[in-house]
Swiss-Prot record:
Name of the protein in question: Phosphomethylpyrimidine synthase
Cofactor list: [4Fe-4S] cluster
Database matches in PANTHER family: PHOSPHOMETHYLPYRIMIDINE SYNTHASE, CHLOROPLASTIC (PTHR30557:SF1), THIAMINE BIOSYNTHESIS PROTEIN THIC (PTHR30557)
Organism name: Methanococcus vannielii (strain ATCC 35089 / DSM 1224 / JCM 13029 / OCM 148 / SB)
Keyword Ribonucleoprotein found: no
Binding positions (Zn(2+)): 268, 332
This protein's record includes keyword Lyase: yes
Gene transcribed to yield this protein: thiC
Binding site for [4Fe-4S] cluster: 408, 411, 415
Pathway(s) annotated for this protein in UniProt: Cofactor biosynthesis; thiamine diphosphate biosynthesis
EC number: 4.1.99.17
Co-factor binding details: Binds 1 [4Fe-4S] cluster per subunit. The cluster is coordinated with 3 cysteines and an exchangeable S-adenosyl-L-methionine.
Length: 426
């Protein structure tokens, strides 16, 4: 049984009750959203995961990517990133490790958080294939499905799988070349496999078998966008839309089989095209939860892409996206450090909160009211408690204090709130 099959049978699960309470919505309404495929709760039956709802009429969620690379393998560093994710309110974590003992790294990450854990299994397939055969493109089909099944057994809650990369989509890419080609790492693995062997993508060809594995463990399928644009010039081109049409068809097959599914979306999109991209996805994929990377709205800000992504992420979430994948200042430059994980996470949470306020989400608005109340009362500790990041403003206040403990050092004796407050007492 999966959350989806239970919902279709009219069963309200404990996970649904938990999410409904967190979101402050009626649990039967939530069950109907899950039944329609508009909401997913990524929770593998083999792991004690905090239930998190992702989808329409819920708060916008934020994911943190972390993991090793061939150039930097330090499990203690990755666990610090997990700790930061836990502390500062991530809703999910994806382990994208490609260096070191991948199963051990994944195991340690899962032991140190109760948040939903996602992976991109084709990374491990590529690493194993390179070690075994000397090249990623020599990966065999048994290895692909064995890795997926093993990760499902370990308790991975959701998996990004690039099932929409097909011979047809590769042909579209070749006929209508783009500026930057394929920038998705998993998408590149499978594109290269198709081009070299002239074979269909096993994840697409044997999709029903894949669904059997995922359904057995209630792993949520996150349909990867292997043809996502890697620069603004490539946004919303034929390759991207061709793949999206395929993903929409696969969403139908997931729902028919009782497998929870969400769809991943583009990463580099001009601001004026974001709303259209969200509407196209929601239409083609029949309101499946939409998971976007950013989107980044300019390619001119390496070192500041947590900001470019937050700008795009806000409009994306207002326009239909349900799940924001954070972007750190290190994006396009190097592997992120621990502090940059925090910066990226907070930036994405700002985007999510701003979007939820714009959409009238009652939980988001309640937090805004609480902050206003705390500011009216000059209750600094309460303000820090409510803030998305409590530590930074507290430190800043201590660095340049005001003589008046109620005021801050910007205005001091000339604080507008205090001035009007004093007049009101007369």
């Amino acid at each position: 049984m999966t959350q989806l099959t239970d919902a279709k049978s009219g069963i309200v699960t404990e996970e649904m009750k938990f999410v409904a309470d967190e979101e402050k919505i009626d649990v039967n309404y939530l069950r109907k959203l899950i039944e329609k495929g508009y909401v997913v709760i990524p929770k593998n039956i083999n792991r004690k995961t905090k239930p998190v709802g992702i989808g329409d009429n819920l708060r916008t969620k934020v994911n943190v990517n972390l993991g090793t690379s061939p150039d930097f393998i330090d499990i203690s560093c990755e666990l610090k990133k997990v700790e930061i994710s836990n502390k500062y309110g991530a809703d999910a974590i994806m382990d994208l490790s490609t260096g070191g003992n991948l199963p051990e790294i994944r195991s340690q990450i899962m032991k140190n958080t109760n948040l939903p854990i996602g992976t991109v299994p084709i990374y491990e397939v590529g690493v194993d294939s390179k070690e075994k055969y000397g090249r990623v493109i020599d990966m065999d089909e048994d290895l692909i499905f064995n890795v997926i099944e093993r990760q499902a057994q370990e308790g991975v809650d959701f998996m990004t799988l690039h099932c929409g990369i097909t011979k047809q989509s590769v042909d579209t890419l070749n006929k209508d070349p783009r500026k930057m080609g394929v920038v998705s790492r998993g998408g590149a693995f499978l594109t290269a496999y198709i081009m070299y062997h002239n074979k269909e993508n096993p994840l697409y060809r044997d999709f029903d078998y894949l669904l059997e594995i995922l359904k057995e463990h209630d792993v949520t399928l996150s349909l990867g966008d292997g043809m996502r644009p890697g620069c603004l010039q490539d946004n919303t081109d034929r390759a991207q839309i061709q793949e999206l049409i395929t993903l929409g068809e696969l969403v139908d097959r997931c729902r028919e089989k009782g497998v929870q599914v969400m769809v991943e979306g583009p990463g580099h999109v001009p601001y004026n095209n974001i709303q259209a991209n969200m509407q196209i996805q929601k239409t083609i994929c029949k309101n499946a939860p939409f998971y976007v990377l950013g989107p980044i709205v300019t390619d001119l800000a390496p070192g500041y892409d947590h900001i470019t992504a937050a700008i795009g992420g806000t409009l994306a979430a207002v326009s239909g996206a349900n799940f924001l994948c954070y972007v750190t200042p290190a994006e396009h430059v190097r592997l992120m450090k621990e502090e940059e994980v925090k910066e990226g996470l907070i930036a994405s949470k700002i985007a999510a909160q701003a979007a939820d306020v714009a959409k009238g989400n009652p939980v988001a608005w309640n937090k805004e009211r609480q902050m206003a109340d705390a500011r009216i009362k000059h209750d600094w500790e309460r303000q820090f408690e409510i803030a998305l990041d409590s530590d930074k403003p507290k430190k800043m206040r201590e660095e340049i204090p005001s003589k008046d403990e109620k005021a801050c050092s910007v205005c001091g004796d000339y604080c507008a709130l205090l001035m009007v407050e004093e007049l009101g007492k007369r």
